[in-house]
């Protein structure tokens, strides 16, 4: 039976609950325990799949096809445990489930209320898989006091009461602001946050104090006294140069020991942190630097491409090289020649995205990389842009484009070398889609197998002829253009097992030019960099040595 750790936040949002949860999971693993991490989001969207990246950041896709919060990416990267659909839930999903049950008559005519029906649905979610691991770490999105979060706080209060004593603990992350006028760290916001938490029946066992300055011992004692928490369980959470320092930093501050003490686990197994020492060694002792241009649509918010940024960092670790990723808005290249902006870079990456805005700029970035011999990695839409560029400029399909960008019914602007995917094989059955389907949850989502051409560059990178990668797309390159494009040098080196869906393209006579329909960044880890990103950075290093 799993022990439960509930991680909550107070004072302000975006303090790093997700990273704290991931780091704690990694520390418990380092002591030999098995863990699973979950995220409970109070927003009313069913999932983040239809939310704007500017609103929410990236959507992290699991192997089983769930569209989830980017925090699940942190969970996977820090623990190596693949997330599942049952590891993410929102108020929208909870209320949807409750209403479906009401329509079916499952509640036998009772009046449906937040307590007990909504809270019971949340508790049912928490119980899934509780016999599989030693620790279940559950992060509650938002901050204590948010009106949307009240059912979740009530549910975890009830859940802790339902379990035997000592089976659940609460970790609360707050902010210690520094007031420069007085030269002091202020504890009142933390005290009031804990007071709010206690008013709804939850008493924190461990406090994490986010601070940009060293926390004096007297301030820790004061917080421990007024918040009714043991002083050893008042843990500093300082700003760090890199997120991958978090496990070692939290261990130095005693977070994992405080959690084990709260559960009464004594003597505690000693941690083996060699993995994280090696990660930090590779980051801090990089032997060079490469510049990678990320030409995208959502460049104003780096969280929109969070996993890509982290995967590039991992690729740098694999090569003991520092990767300096720089964001360029693709719309710039629709007005300007890309050459002056891109000539100082050692590699170019075009990430996934939706909609027509900026696509001509991405096509020009792909053309620049192809013609100048600069390493190019196109992901999802980035692969489609590379194919359209090759179709226009090599295969002489001058009006090549995507069905996604033909908005007017009956009026075609493009020859669609990229089309709306209406049918594909998933497992042992066929999935069918129509143009007028709902937007949410209707893409080709989750892990699918791809067959690689023996002897191709990608088969050498993967050291395999069959791979499994995660997808999130509803448009696909039309295989009918394969012969024409391969005749011009763009090889279809990865296909779906049935041979109908192109998964990877590459240019053989180019230093490094690869487009993939899937999202390799979602499977990269600091201690296990994704092979595509590792080799992409290696190619960038080679270019940097020629400059």
Swiss-Prot record:
ATP binds at residues 14-19, 71. One of its GO terms (molecular function) is ATP binding. PROSITE patterns: GATASE_TYPE_1. The active site is at 380 (nucleophile), 519, 521. It catalyses: UTP + L-glutamine + ATP + H2O = CTP + L-glutamate + ADP + phosphate + 2 H(+); L-glutamine + H2O = L-glutamate + NH4(+); UTP + NH4(+) + ATP = CTP + ADP + phosphate + 2 H(+). Keywords: ATP-binding, Glutamine amidotransferase, Ligase, Magnesium, Metal-binding, Nucleotide-binding, Pyrimidine biosynthesis. Residues 291-546 form the Glutamine amidotransferase type-1 domain. Its EC number is 6.3.4.2. Belongs to the CTP synthase family. This is CTP synthase. It comes from Cereibacter sphaeroides (strain ATCC 17029 / ATH 2.4.9) (Rhodobacter sphaeroides).
